[in-house]
């Protein structure tokens, strides 16, 4: 019998060769292809016996063919039922997956907001560094949205006492007057 825990993988049309399809189907239910081969063998033997003129042996192989066809159909139905049961079991396990509680969802949202704040801070610092490197004067370009998010998360960001670094303009930086 096939492994009942294995569920067939569905391939889009045109992506699977006939050899790959045969291998996949053989792994899912090996009794069906074996039954087909046995049925074809019995039919071939009955044709050989008919050519030899042995009608009793031909009838024996024709009856064997009918029996083997019946066994192949039984294997086909049993394999289909096993695959259906495995698919239902996999769907049931997926439905019973642990769900996140409200507290876990809030914690994940808080972590995401904190990460976004750190990202905005890093982008701000990077923009200042790039502007200084390019010679432009950048002054406290922090957006109101970033300040609002920092207040919502509870992170205190001191934008007032942040040192301003004027870009070099050819004069000395310490002479502001």
From Swiss-Prot:
Origin superkingdom: Eukaryota
Gene3D superfamilies registered for this protein in UniProt: 6.10.140.1320
Membrane topology, record value: Multi-pass membrane protein
Localisation per UniProt entry: Mitochondrion membrane
Transmembrane segments: 31-48, 61-83
Family indicated by similarity: Belongs to the RCF1 family.
Region of interest: Disordered: 150-177
Coiled-coil region list: 83-129
A GO cellular-component term linked to this record: mitochondrial membrane
Function: Cytochrome c oxidase subunit which plays a role in assembly of respiratory supercomplexes.
Complex and partners: Associates with the respiratory chain complex III/complex IV supercomplex.
Protein's recorded name: Respiratory supercomplex factor 1, mitochondrial
Listed Pfam families: HIG_1_N (PF04588)
Keywords: Coiled coil, Membrane, Mitochondrion, Transmembrane, Transmembrane helix
Domain HIG1: 3-94
